[in-house]
């Protein structure tokens, strides 16, 4: 990926809790080894037919373990009943969008630039959605938890590394969009200077 630092996924998961992801320079850079990429592709094939169920489990667990995440999902903010969440069409749809993103990431896992662009774009969108970076790692942790019984420790570690890569790259995208928005608002706040010729 052209990253100067290769990091393995931390044993404690998720790795951080910085609400805004720090500065773009503070974001951990992770590279995916060839072995990790192969393990991810293989294990994705094993669960591909079960993505809808995994997406629901992931979000129900996310809201149970991190109820503050509901603040970003306004339609679920007042829903406390796990069964209501499990049967929610909106939650199922969002779970499928997340799983679709994971599928696209796996499909691009050997195409570094395309994978980076996909994830950076998602991070930029999350700035617009006002979804702070501290939540990104929670989603990966709940995905892994939902799959824990089906995976080997090697598969789990590979996915931890992938989600660390995804969350750190999303944070970079979030920070880039935050900086772009600030620069645009700075330009709009500057007084316009008109130059007129005096005769």
Labelled PLM ranges:
Residues 2-199:
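Globin-like tetrapyrrole-binding proteins
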């Amino acid at each position: 990926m052209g990253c100067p630092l290769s990091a393995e996924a931390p044993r404690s998961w998720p790795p951080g809790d910085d609400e805004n992801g720090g500065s773009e320079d503070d974001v951990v850079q992770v590279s995916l080894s060839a072995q990790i990429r192969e393990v991810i592709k293989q294990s994705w094939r094993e669960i591909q037919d079960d993505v809808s169920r995994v997406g629901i489990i992931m979000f129900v667990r996310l809201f149970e373990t991190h109820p503050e995440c509901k603040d970003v999902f306004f339609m679920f903010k007042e829903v406390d009943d796990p069964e209501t969440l499990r049967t929610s069409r909106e939650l199922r749809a969002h779970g499928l969008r997340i799983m679709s993103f994971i599928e696209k990431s796996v499909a691009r896992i050997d195409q570094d630039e395309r994978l980076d662009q996909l994830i950076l774009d998602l991070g930029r969108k999350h700035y617009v959605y006002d979804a702070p970076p501290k939540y990104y790692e929670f989603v990966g942790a709940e995905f892994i938890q939902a799959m824990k019984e089906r995976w080997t420790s090697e598969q789990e570690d590979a996915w931890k590394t992938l989600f660390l890569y995804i969350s750190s790259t999303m944070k970079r995208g979030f920070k880039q969009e935050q900086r772009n928005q600030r620069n645009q608002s700075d330009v709009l706040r500057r007084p316009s200077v008109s130059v007129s010729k005096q005769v």
